[in-house]
Swiss-Prot record:
This is Defense protein 4. Pfam families: Cecropin. GO terms for cellular component: extracellular region. The lineage of its organism: Eukaryota, Metazoa, Ecdysozoa, Arthropoda, Hexapoda. It is found in: Secreted. One of its GO terms (biological process) is antibacterial humoral response. It comes from Lonomia obliqua. Belongs to the cecropin family.
Length: 65
């Protein structure tokens, strides 16, 4: 199991190095912007699910002491 995780880490490091070496600065910034938008959209879409959890578990669990 340890050997497999080392191989995965090495492959991901190699692919990251290849990506950085082939991507221009503009492309990198566009990719970073896309990641930020996906994170924002994920947070927004998780809102209704969090509301359902709050309602189902009652007020004591989510209130601050």
């Amino acid at each position: 199991m340890y050997g497999m995780s080392v191989r995965i880490l090495m492959m991901s490091s190699l692919s990251a190095c290849m990506l950085v070496s082939t991507v221009t600065a503009w492309d990198f910034l566009k990719e970073l912007e896309g990641v930020g938008q996906r994170v924002r959209d994920s947070i927004i879409s998780a809102g209704p699910a969090i509301d359902v959890l709050k309602k189902s578990q009652g007020p004591r669990r989510w209130s601050r002491p």
